[in-house]
């Protein structure tokens, strides 16, 4: 008896593995993005003497991450299987919805359920407000504890610069969210229960900051908790824009509004300025790493995650943490088909099968009549 079944290659056997997903993603990012950042640094060296130090900082530390967004775009569109991830970053107008009875591809169904149908500027705004409030809470704690002193020094002529900086910070924060709470999160959720995507995502997010200036154990633990909380927020709210917003609001508030270190990096210009000579470290504030090196930041992010879990338990959504992508879609009662096609109304599967059987029967009758003759 001939067995034509081919054994899966070593590459095929590795692909479902958690380690493969992680290292393949990081490898692609480092290989492709490295060329882009090399070119960006060359451009920055060429214009360094023609722009202010503040503008150089904004372009070099924040706007440069546009390279990471482009790298992710290439990854999502070069490999067709990843395109649904990029779709989940977009906004889908209400007028482009599907008709009743449509059967979607699994990718389109997921992109709609957790992405483009729920992404909105409203969610981005809510995220920005959350980012400001959570960071402001940590700054107030540091001020009341006497760890820092701030003074106001901002001219009206600087407002355009700060608005431009907000856009650049949004690019930087969104690029991290798109890679972590977007690509990595989605690829893990495709094969594993959601809790695996949340946990791995949070840990990797923390490890990505281990080379930041002034880093220590508490900031890394805090950033891991931040990654966990932002992953839960992205899941519970059903869109990534709110995560982009809270990340942007946090970074912009501490770096450009209050002039504090953002993960160890200090802006050249801000609305308020830190009296660095009198800043001290404590359990509330780290003079090198900023409020992210204190207990309040760890507490506020843990509280955010706890609130999300409480709300998920209360409305019964918590069960999704134990489901992979396909199981989640089935739990929501979405009809799916495997092949790619335009999202238009189709005949029911049973009718399609019946038509196929009728065609086969007609062909069989033609063959029988020909044989008889």
Predicted regions and their residues:
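Membrane-interface helix/loop boundary segments of multi-pass membrane proteins
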Residues: 175-200, 232-239
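Membrane-interface helix caps and helix-loop-helix hairpins in membrane proteins
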Residues: 147-152, 209-217
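Small-polar-interrupted transmembrane alpha-helices in polytopic inner-membrane proteins
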Residues: 135-136, 169, 193-210, 223-224
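Membrane-embedded alpha-helical segments of multi-pass membrane proteins
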Residues: 62-71, 159-166, 179, 220-228, ...
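Hydrophobic core of alpha-helical transmembrane segments in multi-pass integral membrane proteins
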Residues: 25-33, 68-77, 131-139, 298-313
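Functionally important transmembrane alpha-helices
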Residues: 30-41, 219-283
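Membrane-helix interface linkers and caps
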Residues: 2-11, 32-126, 132, 141-153, ...
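C-terminal membrane module of polytopic membrane proteins
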Residues: 253-373
């Amino acid at each position: 008896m001939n067995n034509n079944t081919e054994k899966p290659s070593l590459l095929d056997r590795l692909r479902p593995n958690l380690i493969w997903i992680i290292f393949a993603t990081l490898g692609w990012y480092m290989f492709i993005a490295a060329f882009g950042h090399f070119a960006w640094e060359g451009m920055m060296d060429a214009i360094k003497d023609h722009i202010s130090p503040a503008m150089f900082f904004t372009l070099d530390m924040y706007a440069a991450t546009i390279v990471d967004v482009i790298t992710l775009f290439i990854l999502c569109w070069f490999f067709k299987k990843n395109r649904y991830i990029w779709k989940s970053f977009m906004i889908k107008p209400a007028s482009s919805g599907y008709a009743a009875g449509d059967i979607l591809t699994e990718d389109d169904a997921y992109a709609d359920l957790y992405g483009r149908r729920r992404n909105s500027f409203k969610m981005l705004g809510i995220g920005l407000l959350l980012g400001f409030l959570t960071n402001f809470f940590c700054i107030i704690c540091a001020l009341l504890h006497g760890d820092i002193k701030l003074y106001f020094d901002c001219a009206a002529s600087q407002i355009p610069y700060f608005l431009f900086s907000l856009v650049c910070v949004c690019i930087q924060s969104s690029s991290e969210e798109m890679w972590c709470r977007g690509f990595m999160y989605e690829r893990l959720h495709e094969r594993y229960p959601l809790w695996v995507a949340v946990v791995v995502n949070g840990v990797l997010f923390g490890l990505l900051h281990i080379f930041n200036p002034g880093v220590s154990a508490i900031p890394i633990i805090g950033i891991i908790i931040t990654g966990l909380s932002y992953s839960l927020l992205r899941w519970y709210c059903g869109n990534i824009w709110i995560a982009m917003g809270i990340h942007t609001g946090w970074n912009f508030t501490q770096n450009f509004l209050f002039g504090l270190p953002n993960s160890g990096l200090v802006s050249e210009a801000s609305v308020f300025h830190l009296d660095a000579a009198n800043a001290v470290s404590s359990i509330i504030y780290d003079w090198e790493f900023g409020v992210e090196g204190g207990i309040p930041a760890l507490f506020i992010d843990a509280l955010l995650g706890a609130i999300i879990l409480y709300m998920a338990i209360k409305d019964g959504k918590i069960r999704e943490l134990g489901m992979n992508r396909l199981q989640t879609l089935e739990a929501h009662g979405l009809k799916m088909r495997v092949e790619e096609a335009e999202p238009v109304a189709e005949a029911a599967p049973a009718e399609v099968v019946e038509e196929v059987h009728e065609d086969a029967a007609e062909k069989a009758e033609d063959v029988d009549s020909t044989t008889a003759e």
